[in-house]
Protein backbone atom coordinates (compact mmCIF):
# COMPACT_ATOMS: atom_id res chain seq x y z
CA UNK A 1 0.00 0.00 0.00
CA UNK A 2 1.38 3.40 -0.97
CA UNK A 3 2.02 5.90 1.77
CA UNK A 4 0.54 9.34 1.26
CA UNK A 5 3.48 11.13 2.82
CA UNK A 6 6.36 10.95 5.28
CA UNK A 7 5.84 11.75 8.94
CA UNK A 8 9.20 13.40 9.50
CA UNK A 9 12.26 14.71 7.73
CA UNK A 10 14.71 12.12 6.41
CA UNK A 11 18.35 13.20 6.16
CA UNK A 12 20.65 11.38 3.74
CA UNK A 13 24.37 12.11 4.07
CA UNK A 14 27.22 11.71 1.62
CA UNK A 15 27.47 8.31 -0.09
CA UNK A 16 24.43 6.95 1.75
CA UNK A 17 21.69 5.21 -0.24
CA UNK A 18 18.68 7.06 -1.58
CA UNK A 19 15.40 6.19 0.16
CA UNK A 20 13.20 3.49 -1.35
CA UNK A 21 10.26 5.88 -1.51
CA UNK A 22 9.57 9.58 -1.04
CA UNK A 23 7.11 12.38 -1.64
CA UNK A 24 9.58 15.27 -1.96
CA UNK A 25 13.30 15.92 -1.69
CA UNK A 26 15.89 18.68 -1.71
CA UNK A 27 19.67 18.78 -2.03
CA UNK A 28 21.64 21.30 0.04
CA UNK A 29 24.40 22.57 -2.23
CA UNK A 30 26.94 25.26 -1.48
CA UNK A 31 30.43 25.78 -0.07
CA UNK A 32 31.62 23.72 2.88
CA UNK A 33 34.39 24.75 5.30
CA UNK A 34 37.53 22.78 4.53
CA UNK A 35 38.44 22.21 8.16
CA UNK A 36 35.91 23.73 10.55
CA UNK A 37 33.14 21.17 10.04
CA UNK A 38 31.23 22.44 13.06
CA UNK A 39 30.68 25.76 11.27
CA UNK A 40 28.92 24.22 8.27
CA UNK A 41 25.66 26.05 7.48
CA UNK A 42 23.92 22.72 6.76
CA UNK A 43 23.29 22.20 10.48
CA UNK A 44 21.44 25.51 10.68
CA UNK A 45 19.50 24.59 7.54
CA UNK A 46 18.26 21.36 9.13
CA UNK A 47 17.12 23.27 12.21
CA UNK A 48 15.18 25.73 10.04
CA UNK A 49 13.56 22.91 8.06
CA UNK A 50 12.59 21.15 11.29
CA UNK A 51 10.93 24.34 12.53
CA UNK A 52 9.06 24.66 9.24
CA UNK A 53 7.66 21.16 9.64
CA UNK A 54 9.32 19.90 6.47
CA UNK A 55 8.74 16.16 6.17
CA UNK A 56 10.62 15.23 3.01
CA UNK A 57 14.12 14.01 2.16
CA UNK A 58 17.20 16.22 2.55
CA UNK A 59 20.45 15.25 0.82
CA UNK A 60 23.56 16.65 2.50
CA UNK A 61 26.93 16.25 0.72
CA UNK A 62 28.88 15.88 3.95
CA UNK A 63 29.78 12.88 6.07
CA UNK A 64 27.33 11.92 8.78
CA UNK A 65 30.23 11.54 11.24
CA UNK A 66 32.66 14.45 11.04
CA UNK A 67 36.34 13.61 11.22
CA UNK A 68 38.58 16.55 12.23
CA UNK A 69 41.19 17.59 9.69
CA UNK A 70 44.69 16.60 10.86
CA UNK A 71 47.06 19.53 10.20
CA UNK A 72 49.99 17.34 11.24
CA UNK A 73 49.26 14.73 8.57
CA UNK A 74 48.57 16.77 5.46
CA UNK A 75 49.76 14.02 3.09
CA UNK A 76 47.47 11.46 4.71
CA UNK A 77 44.55 13.86 4.57
CA UNK A 78 45.09 14.47 0.86
CA UNK A 79 45.29 10.72 0.15
CA UNK A 80 42.03 10.19 2.03
CA UNK A 81 40.44 13.06 0.14
CA UNK A 82 41.51 11.64 -3.25
CA UNK A 83 40.20 8.19 -2.33
CA UNK A 84 36.71 9.45 -1.48
CA UNK A 85 36.44 12.25 -4.06
CA UNK A 86 35.21 10.10 -6.99
CA UNK A 87 32.61 8.35 -4.85
CA UNK A 88 31.52 11.71 -3.44
CA UNK A 89 31.20 13.26 -6.91
CA UNK A 90 29.21 10.30 -8.25
CA UNK A 91 26.88 10.32 -5.25
CA UNK A 92 26.39 14.08 -5.39
CA UNK A 93 25.65 14.12 -9.11
CA UNK A 94 23.15 11.25 -8.84
CA UNK A 95 21.30 12.88 -5.96
CA UNK A 96 21.26 16.31 -7.58
CA UNK A 97 19.80 14.79 -10.75
CA UNK A 98 17.16 12.88 -8.80
CA UNK A 99 16.07 15.43 -6.21
CA UNK A 100 13.05 17.68 -6.60
CA UNK A 101 14.85 20.91 -5.67
CA UNK A 102 18.47 22.03 -5.30
CA UNK A 103 19.15 24.67 -2.67
CA UNK A 104 22.25 26.74 -3.43
CA UNK A 105 23.14 28.72 -0.33
CA UNK A 106 26.46 30.46 -1.09
CA UNK A 107 27.94 32.20 1.99
CA UNK A 108 31.35 32.25 0.34
CA UNK A 109 34.32 33.11 2.59
CA UNK A 110 37.88 33.78 1.39
CA UNK A 111 39.57 34.91 4.60
CA UNK A 112 43.07 33.51 5.31
CA UNK A 113 41.87 32.17 8.67
CA UNK A 114 38.69 30.55 7.32
CA UNK A 115 38.26 29.14 3.82
CA UNK A 116 34.87 28.39 2.30
CA UNK A 117 35.69 29.21 -1.31
CA UNK A 118 33.09 27.10 -3.10
CA UNK A 119 34.96 26.12 -6.27
CA UNK A 120 32.94 22.92 -6.55
CA UNK A 121 29.80 24.97 -5.94
CA UNK A 122 30.56 27.02 -9.05
CA UNK A 123 30.82 23.86 -11.16
CA UNK A 124 27.60 22.37 -9.77
CA UNK A 125 25.78 25.67 -10.19
CA UNK A 126 26.59 25.79 -13.89
CA UNK A 127 25.89 22.12 -14.37
CA UNK A 128 22.33 22.36 -13.03
CA UNK A 129 21.49 25.93 -14.05
CA UNK A 130 18.95 24.74 -16.63
CA UNK A 131 17.34 22.09 -14.44
CA UNK A 132 14.49 24.49 -13.53
CA UNK A 133 14.64 23.40 -9.89
CA UNK A 134 17.20 25.73 -8.26
CA UNK A 135 16.58 27.87 -5.19
CA UNK A 136 19.41 30.32 -4.65
CA UNK A 137 20.54 32.55 -1.84
CA UNK A 138 23.60 34.32 -0.46
CA UNK A 139 24.40 37.02 2.11
CA UNK A 140 24.98 40.45 0.59
CA UNK A 141 28.53 40.47 1.87
CA UNK A 142 29.50 37.12 0.28
CA UNK A 143 32.30 37.79 -2.27
CA UNK A 144 32.74 36.54 -5.82
CA UNK A 145 29.09 35.74 -6.56
CA UNK A 146 28.68 38.34 -9.31
CA UNK A 147 29.09 35.87 -12.17
CA UNK A 148 26.58 33.45 -10.68
CA UNK A 149 24.14 36.35 -10.38
CA UNK A 150 24.60 37.35 -14.01
CA UNK A 151 23.97 33.90 -15.48
CA UNK A 152 20.96 33.10 -13.32
CA UNK A 153 19.08 36.23 -12.25
CA UNK A 154 16.75 36.29 -15.28
CA UNK A 155 15.55 32.80 -14.44
CA UNK A 156 15.79 32.56 -10.66
CA UNK A 157 15.17 34.76 -7.62
CA UNK A 158 18.14 35.30 -5.31
CA UNK A 159 17.30 35.32 -1.59
CA UNK A 160 19.36 37.11 1.05
CA UNK A 161 18.91 34.75 3.98
CA UNK A 162 19.12 31.01 4.39
CA UNK A 163 15.66 30.96 5.94
CA UNK A 164 14.08 32.75 2.98
CA UNK A 165 15.82 30.42 0.54
CA UNK A 166 14.54 27.35 2.37
CA UNK A 167 11.07 28.82 2.75
CA UNK A 168 10.77 29.29 -1.01
CA UNK A 169 11.95 25.72 -1.54
CA UNK A 170 9.47 24.22 0.93
CA UNK A 171 6.60 26.22 -0.58
CA UNK A 172 7.52 24.98 -4.06
CA UNK A 173 7.62 21.34 -2.96
CA UNK A 174 4.26 21.56 -1.20
CA UNK A 175 2.76 18.16 -0.45
CA UNK A 176 4.94 16.52 -3.10
CA UNK A 177 3.91 13.35 -4.90
CA UNK A 178 4.53 9.75 -3.89
CA UNK A 179 7.23 7.83 -5.78
CA UNK A 180 8.88 4.50 -5.08
CA UNK A 181 11.81 2.41 -6.32
CA UNK A 182 13.27 3.92 -9.53
CA UNK A 183 10.60 6.64 -9.52
CA UNK A 184 12.62 8.28 -6.72
CA UNK A 185 15.16 9.23 -9.40
CA UNK A 186 12.59 11.28 -11.32
CA UNK A 187 12.33 14.95 -10.24
CA UNK A 188 8.84 15.90 -9.11
CA UNK A 189 8.14 18.47 -11.85
CA UNK A 190 9.09 15.91 -14.50
CA UNK A 191 7.16 13.07 -12.87
CA UNK A 192 4.00 15.19 -12.66
CA UNK A 193 4.26 16.50 -16.22
CA UNK A 194 1.71 15.36 -18.76
CA UNK A 195 4.50 14.63 -21.24
CA UNK A 196 6.14 12.11 -18.91
CA UNK A 197 2.95 10.57 -17.56
CA UNK A 198 1.57 9.93 -21.06
CA UNK A 199 4.67 7.83 -21.80
CA UNK A 200 5.03 6.23 -18.36
CA UNK A 201 1.43 5.04 -18.02
CA UNK A 202 1.67 3.23 -21.34
CA UNK A 203 4.78 1.40 -20.09
CA UNK A 204 3.04 0.32 -16.90
CA UNK A 205 -0.08 -0.75 -18.80
CA UNK A 206 1.87 -3.48 -20.63
CA UNK A 207 3.82 -4.63 -17.57
CA UNK A 208 7.03 -2.71 -18.22
CA UNK A 209 8.77 -0.80 -15.45
CA UNK A 210 11.76 1.47 -14.92
CA UNK A 211 15.08 0.14 -13.66
CA UNK A 212 16.94 3.42 -14.15
CA UNK A 213 16.32 7.05 -15.10
CA UNK A 214 18.33 10.15 -15.84
CA UNK A 215 17.09 13.55 -16.96
CA UNK A 216 19.14 14.91 -19.86
CA UNK A 217 17.42 18.12 -20.98
CA UNK A 218 14.26 20.12 -20.50
CA UNK A 219 12.91 23.21 -22.22
CA UNK A 220 10.56 25.72 -20.63
CA UNK A 221 8.64 28.10 -22.90
CA UNK A 222 10.13 31.56 -22.12
CA UNK A 223 6.85 33.51 -22.16
CA UNK A 224 4.48 30.93 -20.73
CA UNK A 225 7.04 29.66 -18.18
CA UNK A 226 5.70 26.16 -18.74
CA UNK A 227 7.56 22.91 -19.35
CA UNK A 228 7.30 22.09 -23.04
CA UNK A 229 9.86 19.42 -23.90
CA UNK A 230 11.83 16.79 -21.99
CA UNK A 231 14.64 14.46 -23.00
CA UNK A 232 15.32 11.62 -20.60
CA UNK A 233 17.34 8.41 -20.59
CA UNK A 234 15.37 5.51 -19.09
CA UNK A 235 16.31 1.92 -18.41
CA UNK A 236 13.19 -0.14 -19.06
CA UNK A 237 12.39 -3.72 -18.13
CA UNK A 238 10.45 -5.12 -21.11
CA UNK A 239 7.93 -7.63 -19.78
CA UNK A 240 7.18 -9.14 -23.20
CA UNK A 241 10.84 -9.99 -23.76
CA UNK A 242 12.07 -10.40 -20.16
CA UNK A 243 15.03 -8.07 -20.64
CA UNK A 244 16.22 -4.54 -19.89
CA UNK A 245 16.88 -1.93 -22.58
CA UNK A 246 18.89 1.11 -21.55
CA UNK A 247 20.57 2.60 -24.62
CA UNK A 248 17.92 4.98 -25.94
CA UNK A 249 16.63 8.46 -25.21
CA UNK A 250 13.03 9.59 -25.11
CA UNK A 251 12.01 13.00 -26.44
CA UNK A 252 8.71 13.91 -24.78
CA UNK A 253 6.66 16.98 -25.62
CA UNK A 254 3.02 17.98 -25.48
CA UNK A 255 0.65 16.07 -27.78
CA UNK A 256 -0.48 17.72 -31.00
CA UNK A 257 -3.64 18.18 -33.06
CA UNK A 258 -3.49 18.30 -36.87
CA UNK A 259 -6.27 19.00 -39.36
CA UNK A 260 -6.73 17.67 -42.87
CA UNK A 261 -8.93 20.31 -44.50
CA UNK A 262 -9.84 19.02 -47.96
CA UNK A 263 -12.18 19.33 -50.92
CA UNK A 264 -13.22 15.89 -52.15
CA UNK A 265 -12.93 14.77 -55.77
CA UNK A 266 -13.89 11.46 -57.38
CA UNK A 267 -10.25 10.44 -57.59
CA UNK A 268 -8.78 10.91 -54.10
CA UNK A 269 -5.39 11.83 -55.60
CA UNK A 270 -7.11 14.79 -57.27
CA UNK A 271 -8.78 15.88 -54.03
CA UNK A 272 -7.48 19.23 -52.81
CA UNK A 273 -5.89 19.79 -49.40
CA UNK A 274 -4.71 22.84 -47.48
CA UNK A 275 -1.02 23.08 -46.61
CA UNK A 276 0.84 25.64 -44.53
CA UNK A 277 4.21 26.91 -45.75
CA UNK A 278 6.48 28.19 -42.99
CA UNK A 279 10.16 28.38 -42.13
CA UNK A 280 11.06 26.08 -39.23
CA UNK A 281 14.65 25.81 -38.05
CA UNK A 282 15.01 21.99 -38.33
CA UNK A 283 13.94 22.00 -41.99
CA UNK A 284 16.27 20.14 -44.34
CA UNK A 285 14.87 20.14 -47.87
CA UNK A 286 15.63 21.85 -51.17
CA UNK A 287 13.24 24.73 -50.55
CA UNK A 288 14.23 25.25 -46.90
CA UNK A 289 10.56 25.70 -46.02
CA UNK A 290 8.15 23.35 -44.26
CA UNK A 291 4.96 22.30 -46.00
CA UNK A 292 2.55 20.65 -43.59
CA UNK A 293 -1.05 20.34 -42.51
CA UNK A 294 -2.32 23.01 -40.12
CA UNK A 295 -1.84 21.96 -36.53
CA UNK A 296 -0.11 22.49 -33.22
CA UNK A 297 -0.41 22.05 -29.49
CA UNK A 298 -1.63 23.92 -26.43
CA UNK A 299 0.04 24.62 -23.10
CA UNK A 300 -3.36 25.15 -21.50
CA UNK A 301 -4.20 21.95 -19.56
CA UNK A 302 -7.92 22.72 -19.97
CA UNK A 303 -7.79 22.61 -23.79
CA UNK A 304 -8.98 19.33 -25.31
CA UNK A 305 -7.65 18.05 -28.63
CA UNK A 306 -10.70 19.24 -30.57
CA UNK A 307 -10.51 22.76 -29.14
CA UNK A 308 -6.82 22.85 -30.02
CA UNK A 309 -7.54 21.70 -33.58
CA UNK A 310 -10.26 24.32 -34.04
CA UNK A 311 -8.00 27.07 -32.70
CA UNK A 312 -5.03 26.04 -34.85
CA UNK A 313 -7.13 25.95 -38.02
CA UNK A 314 -8.30 29.49 -37.39
CA UNK A 315 -4.83 30.79 -36.49
CA UNK A 316 -2.96 29.14 -39.34
CA UNK A 317 -5.34 29.46 -42.31
CA UNK A 318 -7.96 31.93 -41.05
CA UNK A 319 -10.82 29.42 -41.20
CA UNK A 320 -13.23 29.35 -38.26
CA UNK A 321 -15.55 26.34 -38.44
CA UNK A 322 -18.16 24.74 -36.21
CA UNK A 323 -16.56 21.98 -34.16
CA UNK A 324 -19.25 19.56 -35.33
CA UNK A 325 -17.56 19.51 -38.73
CA UNK A 326 -14.33 18.05 -37.33
CA UNK A 327 -14.08 14.27 -37.60
CA UNK A 328 -11.35 12.47 -35.65
CA UNK A 329 -9.35 10.10 -37.85
CA UNK A 330 -6.69 8.55 -35.59
CA UNK A 331 -4.33 9.06 -32.67
CA UNK A 332 -0.75 7.93 -33.33
CA UNK A 333 2.89 8.72 -32.61
CA UNK A 334 4.69 10.70 -35.28
CA UNK A 335 8.16 9.16 -34.82
CA UNK A 336 7.99 6.25 -32.41
CA UNK A 337 11.73 5.52 -32.38
CA UNK A 338 12.53 8.91 -30.86
CA UNK A 339 9.50 10.94 -29.76
CA UNK A 340 6.83 9.75 -27.32
CA UNK A 341 4.19 12.38 -28.07
CA UNK A 342 1.13 11.58 -30.15
CA UNK A 343 -0.74 13.38 -32.90
CA UNK A 344 -4.50 13.31 -33.15
CA UNK A 345 -5.61 13.84 -36.74
CA UNK A 346 -8.92 15.48 -37.56
CA UNK A 347 -10.37 15.97 -41.01
CA UNK A 348 -12.78 18.61 -42.26
CA UNK A 349 -14.48 18.41 -45.65
CA UNK A 350 -14.66 21.86 -47.22
CA UNK A 351 -17.33 23.26 -49.50
CA UNK A 352 -16.59 24.49 -53.01
CA UNK A 353 -17.08 28.06 -51.81
CA UNK A 354 -14.60 27.58 -48.94
CA UNK A 355 -11.89 25.99 -51.09
CA UNK A 356 -12.20 28.72 -53.75
CA UNK A 357 -11.95 31.43 -51.09
CA UNK A 358 -8.79 29.86 -49.68
CA UNK A 359 -7.22 29.69 -53.15
CA UNK A 360 -7.50 33.49 -53.35
CA UNK A 361 -6.04 34.09 -49.88
CA UNK A 362 -2.56 35.63 -50.19
CA UNK A 363 -2.41 36.99 -46.64
CA UNK A 364 0.07 35.95 -43.97
CA UNK A 365 -1.35 33.88 -41.13
CA UNK A 366 -0.15 32.64 -37.76
CA UNK A 367 0.59 34.17 -34.37
CA UNK A 368 3.14 36.84 -35.21
CA UNK A 369 4.34 37.27 -31.61
CA UNK A 370 5.20 33.55 -31.62
CA UNK A 371 7.32 34.15 -34.76
CA UNK A 372 4.82 32.34 -37.01
CA UNK A 373 4.65 33.54 -40.61
CA UNK A 374 2.41 31.16 -42.55
CA UNK A 375 1.45 31.15 -46.22
CA UNK A 376 -1.36 28.79 -47.17
CA UNK A 377 -1.46 26.63 -50.30
CA UNK A 378 -4.18 24.57 -51.96
CA UNK A 379 -2.74 21.46 -53.63
CA UNK A 380 -3.99 18.16 -54.94
CA UNK A 381 -3.14 15.14 -52.83
CA UNK A 382 -0.72 14.03 -55.56
CA UNK A 383 1.08 17.39 -55.41
CA UNK A 384 1.02 17.58 -51.61
CA UNK A 385 2.72 14.25 -50.91
CA UNK A 386 5.71 15.42 -52.96
CA UNK A 387 6.03 18.49 -50.73
CA UNK A 388 5.46 17.20 -47.19
CA UNK A 389 7.48 14.97 -44.86
CA UNK A 390 6.70 11.31 -44.18
CA UNK A 391 4.52 12.04 -41.15
CA UNK A 392 2.32 14.43 -43.11
CA UNK A 393 2.26 12.03 -46.06
CA UNK A 394 0.80 9.36 -43.83
CA UNK A 395 -1.75 11.71 -42.28
CA UNK A 396 -2.95 12.96 -45.66
CA UNK A 397 -3.32 9.50 -47.18
CA UNK A 398 -5.04 7.98 -44.17
CA UNK A 399 -7.35 10.96 -43.76
CA UNK A 400 -8.37 10.99 -47.41
CA UNK A 401 -8.80 7.21 -47.47
CA UNK A 402 -10.98 6.85 -44.37
Where would I find each of the regions flagged by the language model?
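Conserved catalytic or regulatory cores that recognize and/or transform ribose-phosphate-containing ligands
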Residues: 1-183
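Hydrophobic alpha-helical segments that mediate membrane insertion or helix-helix packing
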Residues: 28, 128, 309-313, 317
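Conserved short-loop catalytic and cofactor-binding motifs
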Residues: 29, 80, 113-116, 247, ...
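Internal, well-ordered alpha-helical scaffold/interface segments
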Residues: 43, 90-93, 97-100, 291, ...
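Short glycine/proline-rich, acidic loop/turn segments that cap or connect secondary-structure elements
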Residues: 138-150, 364-378
Amino acid sequence: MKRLGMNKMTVVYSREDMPKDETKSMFLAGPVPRKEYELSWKKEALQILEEMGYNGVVYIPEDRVKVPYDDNNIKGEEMKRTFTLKAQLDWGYSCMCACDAIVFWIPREMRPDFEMIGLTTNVEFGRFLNSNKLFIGAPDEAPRNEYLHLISEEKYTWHKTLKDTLKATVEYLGQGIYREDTEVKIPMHIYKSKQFQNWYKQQLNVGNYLTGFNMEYEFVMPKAKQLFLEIFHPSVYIAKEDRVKDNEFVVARTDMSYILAYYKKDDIMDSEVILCEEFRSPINNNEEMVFELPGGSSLNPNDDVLSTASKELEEEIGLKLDKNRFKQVALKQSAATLCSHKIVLFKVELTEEEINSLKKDNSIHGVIEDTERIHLHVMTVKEAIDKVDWTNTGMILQGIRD
